[in-house]
Amino acid sequence: MKKNLLLIFFILFSTKSQASVKNEIIKSFSEIENLNFEFTQTINGKDETGNCSIVFPKKIYCKYNFRFNKVLVSNGSSLVIRSDKNNQYYRYSLKDTALNLLLDKKYILKKMRNLKGSLIDEKFFLFSIEENNQTLNIFFDKDNYNLIGWQTEDIYQNLTITYIYDLKVNQNIEDKIFKLPKNN
C-alpha cells in the first residue's frame, strides 16, 4: 500500500501540470520583443526553407532558400511577397492574413491566458486561436517553453505549417529590413 501511494505521489509531482506549463509559456513569450530563426514551411505538401526575423508588433522579414529569391515582408500594415520567378510581386493588407494574428503578441498573450491549451505527445503545447474565420495553431516546446511553429491557412486557403528552429530571442534587428520591397 505504501509503495502504491509513493508511486502515485511521485507521478503526480514529477510531471509538470498543464497549467504550470501554460503559465511558463505565457511568461516566457511575454518577455520576447523579437525573434530570429530558421524555418521549414510546408504548403500543399511542398517544403520551403529560409530564415525570418520578427519584431513585435506585426513586423516580419523572411528570406527563402529558393532559387527565385523569394522574400516575405510586413512593415506592420502591409504584407509583400516578392519573387524573381516571373517577376512576381504581391501586396496584401496585413489585416486580411493570418499573420496579422501571429504577429500581434498582445493579442496572442490575451488569447493564451483565456485558452486551456493542449499537450501533444508529451512534447508540445498547443494553443488554438480562432478569429474572423481563421484558425491559428501555435506550438511551443513543453520543456523549454520556446515557440516552435504554427499552422494556419494562407490567403489562398492552403494549409500552411511552419516549423522553426535555431531560435534566437531579443537580438539586435535593424528596422530597415522591414521596408517593403519595390515592385520591379
Regions found by a protein language model. Name each.
Residues 4-13:
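Sec-dependent N-terminal signal peptides
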Residues 17-19:
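Boundary at the C-terminal end of the N-terminal hydrophobic targeting segment
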Residues 41, 58, 64-68, 76-78, ...:
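A mature extracytoplasmic/lumenal domain signature
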Residues 52-101, 160:
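An acidic-aromatic
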Residues 85-124:
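Flexible, surface-exposed loop/linker segments and immediately adjacent secondary-structure boundaries
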Residues 110-184:
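Gly/Pro-enriched, hydrophobic low-complexity segments
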